[in-house]
């Protein structure tokens, strides 16, 4: 597999112990909004991150949740050795995987799943699309909505973008995700059958949202998520 060399453009600590890392590929690095990359660094393995920038930008942006020994070591490594190898972009969670339509697009994320939402939203803006975008970003604390100001600014600046920040301190995942589901249905229950969705979060969250929306008439084939590939349901 051919890798691409990239250098560190900048690294910034955001709120919620999340770091924004922007890498500058030294040669062309093609990707589609919604795909992910893998960093190739000696001493590390399984460094998969969703690309948070859109393809029109000159760098590859990553959102890294620190706190674990592995992620903390990675941040320290990038600060010391600002050059990495990138495997080719991969992943099928892209809008070209869905039927072409101007119907509302639900962009649903928890935690650093916002990276995927950001890439897709910015790609739509770069293409001057007027398609309605409804962003639902959930977390158990406000600090973990680390780019909420950006998402809210989109909603202020563009009439076709709507942002909902959902904070739940519930520890049980069914209770935690019910607020998210209720918020989506309160906005779209009457026309949920025509909506499409991109869902970025844990398998429990993704499947809970999918099942609840399908019960109300949503077409399951119109939701995309990386979860469907890395954690598929058993038949």
Go through each PLM region and give its residues.
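Short, Lys/Arg- and Gly-enriched loop/turn segments at beta-strand edges
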Residues: 45-52, 91-99
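Histidine-anchored nucleotide/phosphate-binding helix
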Residues: 114-126
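Short, conserved phosphate/pyrophosphate- and ester-handling motifs at nucleotide-, phospho-/glycolipid
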Residues: 34, 113, 202
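Phosphate- and divalent-cation-binding pockets in alpha/beta enzyme and binding domains
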Residues: 73, 116-119, 208-209
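A structural signal for isolated positions on well-ordered beta-strands in alpha/beta enzyme cores
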Residues: 61, 85, 106, 132-136, ...
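Ferredoxin-reductase
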Residues: 2-82, 141, 169
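Reductase modules of NAD(P)H-dependent flavoproteins
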Residues: 2, 71, 140-235
């Amino acid at each position: 597999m051919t890798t691409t060399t990239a250098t560190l453009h900048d690294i910034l600590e955001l709120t919620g112990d999340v770091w924004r890392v922007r890498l500058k590929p030294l040669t062309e690095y093609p990707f589609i909004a919604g795909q992910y990359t893998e960093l190739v660094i000696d001493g590390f393995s399984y460094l998969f991150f969703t690309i948070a920038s859109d393809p029109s930008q000159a760098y590859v942006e990553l959102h890294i949740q620190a706190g674990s020994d592995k992620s903390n070591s990675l941040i320290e490594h990038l600060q010391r050795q600002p050059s990495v190898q990138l495997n080719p972009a991969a992943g099928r969670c892209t809008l070209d995987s869905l039927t072409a339509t101007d119907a509302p697009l639900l962009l649903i994320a928890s935690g650093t799943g916002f990276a995927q939402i950001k890439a897709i939203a910015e790609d739509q803006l770069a293409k001057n699309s007027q398609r309605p975008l409804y962003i639902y970003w959930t977390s158990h604390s406000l600090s973990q909505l680390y780019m909420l100001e950006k998402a809210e600014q989109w909603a202020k600046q563009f009439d076709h973008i709507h942002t909902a920040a959902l904070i739940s301190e519930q520890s049980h995942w069914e209770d935690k995700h019910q607020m998210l589901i209720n918020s989506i249905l309160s906005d779209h229950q009457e026309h949920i059958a025509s909506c499409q969705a991109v869902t970025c979060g844990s398998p429990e969250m993704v499947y809970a949202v999918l099942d609840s929306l399908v019960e109300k008439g949503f077409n399951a084939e119109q939701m995309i998520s990386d979860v469907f590939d890395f954690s598929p349901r058993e038949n």
